[in-house]
A protein has these predicted regions:
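Metallo-beta-lactamase
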Residues: 1-119
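Short, glycine/charged-enriched secondary-structure capping and boundary segments
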Residues: 9-12, 50, 71-74, 124-126, ...
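Short, flexible hinge/linker loops that cap or flank conserved catalytic cores
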Residues: 27, 50, 134-137
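N-terminal beta1-alpha1-beta2 submodule of the flavodoxin-like/Rossmannoid cofactor-binding fold
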Residues: 121-183
């Protein structure tokens, strides 16, 4: 890493550098930073930082979302799309990160993408737990289809109606070529 930094910033060649390891803490006086490695929570070299004085987790790509910084909008919709688009295939690594983070007293989460989270943190952690365990958020049936001539669409709609008639309480159907699947 130092070699790469010096290639981009040769003026830092003579500056003192510190290599940190997973779980190490750097005491800066009024702030203490603990480094939490989170490999494959998007990239192999991902590292998060926990600041224990203010109880802030700088979470890198974890707990991020697409869209504006507004926390008044439905966080879960764009966070879900972000999670499954960016880190969704690394559920085991996210599970390991959640276990590490469980031991930290976190009052604020600062992701690289999306709003700073400082209320209802259990809501966000629980969603990440559900997503990373590949568990459904709700019980129901999701029918995804695409149809060039309309025949598959008719079959999908018929199947959806049959499921409702049989008592399935939640049936969602979407045309993968035309609908916004983030919704």
């Amino acid at each position: 890493t130092f070699t790469m930094i010096e290639q981009f910033f040769p003026e830092l060649d003579s500056v003192e550098k510190v290599e940190v390891k997973d779980g190490e803490t750097l005491d800066l006086g009024s702030h203490k930073l603990t480094f939490v490695f989170a490999p494959m929570v998007h990239w192999p070299e991902v590292m998060m930082t926990y600041e224990s004085t203010e109880k802030i987790l700088f979470s890198a790509d974890a707990f991020g979302k697409f869209g504006a910084r507004d926390t008044d909008e439905d966080w879960a919709c764009e966070a879900r799309r972000y999670y499954f688009g960016i880190v969704g295939k690394y559920g085991a690594q996210v599970q390991a990160l959640l276990k590490k983070a469980a031991g930290l007293d976190i009052q604020t989460i600062c992701p690289l993408h999306g709003p700073v989270l400082n209320e209802n943190l259990d809501f966000y952690r629980n969603l990440y737990q559900t997503w990373s365990a590949y568990e459904p958020e709700d019980k129901g049936v999701f029918i995804a289809y695409t149809s060039v001539y309309g025949n598959t669409k008719k079959a999908a709609e018929l199947l959806a109606q049959m499921l409702v008639d049989k008592g399935c309480e939640k049936v969602a159907i979407t045309d993968l070529a035309r609908d916004d699947i983030a919704e």
